[in-house]
Structure formats: structure tokens, C-alpha cells
């Protein structure tokens, strides 16, 4: 967590510097087809991005002070110290491929604004997600 909060603080510093540069750059650019002065949309986004990274860095910093030393902060830690339980892996499941196809159908429906294709893709995605979650909860004769 200590390294993560330092990364967030350094990102916030970078974004603050870029926001200041953006402020001065947009104030001195004059375009006859556009209004002269500070460009608000980009400037507000830069400032809000800075504030959000400061907020996240502060949260990580305060959380790090209240917990024990994590394996990534301990210099003598092994890789196995941070490794958790991976759980069960199904190497022969067809449902991730089917979900990819359903997402592709849904994506094509959204791209081309075909509502019938969006509906079919959504139904397929719900069905394939359900089957992925229930593939070992259904008896073998129902597969």
C-alpha cells in the first residue's frame, strides 16, 4: 500500500503540473473561430483528475497506516506470501467462448443501432453467464 499511495501522489503531482500548463496554454491561444480565454471543459477535467488521484492516494495512505505490513511492502517476502487461493479452474468449459460471442452480438447491435440485435445479444449474454455460473451445479444428465 505504501508504494501504491506514492504512485497516486506522483500521478496527482503530474496531473497538477499538466493542469497548470493547460491553463496557461489555453489562455494564450487565440483562434478567430473560437472564444478567447481559458478552455473550461479540459481544464475542469484536469483539475478533477488531480483531485481524484489525491483522494485515492490519501485513502491508500490512511489505510496503510491502520493495517499490518503487506507482503509487497516487506523486503524479505516471497511470491508465495502474497499468493492466495486460486480456486477451481475449468479447462474444458465452452461458456467463456459462448459469452464472447454473445458480447460480440451485443456490441454489433450497439454499433449499428439494431435494437433487435441488442435484444438478442442481451438475452444470449444473460443465458451464457447463467450457464457459466451453473455449469457444475446442474446434474451431468442435464448438460
Curated annotation (Swiss-Prot):
It comes from the Bacteria. The keyword Nuclease does not apply. InterPro entries: Cyt_c_oxidase_su4_actinobac. Part of cytochrome c oxidase, its function is unknown. It comes from Corynebacterium diphtheriae (strain ATCC 700971 / NCTC 13129 / Biotype gravis). One of its GO terms (biological process) is electron transport chain. Its EC number is 7.1.1.9. Keywords: Cell membrane, Membrane, Translocase, Transmembrane, Transmembrane helix. One of its GO terms (cellular component) is plasma membrane. It is found in: Cell membrane. Associates with subunits I, II and III to form cytochrome c oxidase. Coiled coil: none annotated. It catalyses: 4 Fe(II)-[cytochrome c] + O2 + 8 H(+)(in) = 4 Fe(III)-[cytochrome c] + 2 H2O + 4 H(+)(out). The gene is ctaF. GO terms for molecular function: cytochrome-c oxidase activity. It is a multi-pass membrane protein. Belongs to the cytochrome c oxidase bacterial subunit CtaF family. The chain crosses the membrane at residues 7-27, 40-60, 85-105, 106-126. This is Cytochrome c oxidase polypeptide 4.
